[in-house]
């Protein structure tokens, strides 16, 4: 069985850079830990892409799931045939998500 694909949109890549940088201001080790935990979470999500809730009020085909243990949510789309996911954004819960999609 092939591993599912995990694609990052340019905005998601930028989100990760900004989140990691923000965490690193206080604790560089914690920032590295965050990135590792995020990678593990994304693998789990790609293997189980339907576990997130649908978000039709934001965009067609969009789903979201909270990143457990953090105040962030992951917004993603399932690749046709459920062969993987495209991460659209990773956003803090305090953000006005409706304005960002």
PLM region descriptions:
Residues 67-101:
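Enriched for short, Lys/Arg-rich terminal
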Residues 1-62, 80:
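Basic, Lys/Arg-enriched alpha-helical interface segments
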């Amino acid at each position: 069985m092939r591993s599912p694909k995990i694609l990052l949109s340019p905005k998601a890549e930028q989100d990760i850079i900004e989140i990691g940088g923000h965490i690193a201001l206080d604790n560089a080790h914690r920032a590295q830990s965050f990135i590792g935990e995020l990678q593990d979470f994304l693998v789990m999500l790609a293997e189980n892409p339907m576990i997130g809730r649908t978000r039709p009020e934001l965009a067609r085909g969009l789903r979201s799931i909270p990143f457990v243990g953090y105040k962030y949510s992951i917004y993603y789309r399932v690749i046709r045939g459920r062969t993987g996911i495209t991460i659209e954004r990773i956003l803090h819960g305090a953000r006005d998500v409706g304005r960002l999609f």
